[in-house]
Design a protein with these regions (language model features):
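A conserved active-site cap/scaffold subdomain adjacent to cofactor or substrate pockets
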Residues: 262, 267-272
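Short, well-ordered beta-strand elements within core beta-sheets of diverse protein domains
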Residues: 114-118, 204, 261-264
């Protein structure tokens, strides 16, 4: 069959319309998760307000809990006036979905959005955060409230516990200080567990004899933290999302930036204790 120019143009137009329709259909298909990046005024204690950028109006961002091996779609909407990007820390996913510029992932333009599609693995405690370069601006990148926990549920038998609690550590109002070799060190005015300073958060209520599994993330840009639960020892069952080959009971743990730890605690001493 001979194809004249008019028939070709009609066919090409229909193909373009079909492509546009497919794009529109994809845009209308709801994602499994939606993250909105936007400025936030965060009150970490009475009278202490942090001006930052966060996901979905809170710090940390929403917990993403997803079965291992099940595909997921995540829409990220950038409601700031600068380009942004989201990195899925600890996941084995294609480089263009990874959310790291050095791996080839594109930035999300100011006012723009992007859909990430991948299959989360491996199982364990992962997290997501901005991968935008802060440079000399200590109110951008990892210094902001752009972080959240991503827990990939294992296909294997789950651990035995009575409660499961996610905690994130972060530091705020960074500034450069020191002198000599320390002139490039970052210092901070405030530190928080989740979104509150120590002494201003809601208490964690447990019953005597319960086994509580804590998932703790150090989301600070540069600060290392020590963590202990007064009156108790903690059992380390996982590090950076992976089960440890041999569990260990310790009085305290040390977390460098971006490190995660899974701690099992037997609540065997009634009273009020400080974490």
């Amino acid at each position: 069959m001979r194809l004249n120019r008019r028939d070709f143009l009609i066919g090409a137009s229909l193909a373009l319309l079909g492509t546009a329709a497919n794009k529109k259909l994809c845009a209308q298909t709801p994602a499994d998760v939606r993250l909105e990046i936007a400025p936030l005024k965060l009150e970490i204690a009475p009278g202490k307000v942090i001006h930052t950028v966060a996901y979905n109006g809170g710090v940390p961002g929403p917990l993403i809990r997803w079965p291992e091996g099940k595909p997921i779609t995540i829409d990220v909407v950038n409601q700031t006036d600068v380009p942004e990007i989201v990195h899925w820390h600890g996941l084995w996913i294609p480089s263009d979905e990874d959310g790291a510029l050095e791996e080839g992932s594109p930035m999300i333009a100011a006012g723009g959005q992007r859909r990430y599609s991948f299959t989360p693995r491996p199982a364990g405690f992962r997290w997501y955060h901005t991968h935008a370069f802060a440079g000399h601006d200590l109110k951008r990148g990892g210094y902001t409230g752009q972080f959240g926990c991503f827990y990939i549920e294992s296909k294997q038998a789950p651990s035995v516990h009575d409660q499961e609690i996610f905690l994130t550590l972060h530091d705020w109002n960074a500034y450069m200080g020191g002198g000599g070799d320390a002139s490039m060190d970052a210092f901070y005015d405030y530190a928080t567990i989740n979104d509150r300073m120590l002494g201003h958060g809601d208490p964690i209520k447990v019953r005597e004899g319960q086994r509580v599994l804590f998932h703790v993330l150090n989301a600070s840009a540069t600060a290392t933290h020590w963590l202990a639960l007064a009156g108790h020892e903690v059992t380390v069952v996982g590090m950076d999302g992976n089960e440890v080959p041999q569990q260990a009971r310790v009085p305290a743990v040390r977390l460098a930036p971006a490190e995660r730890i899974d701690l099992l605690v037997e609540m065997n001493r009634p009273g009020v204790w400080v974490l």
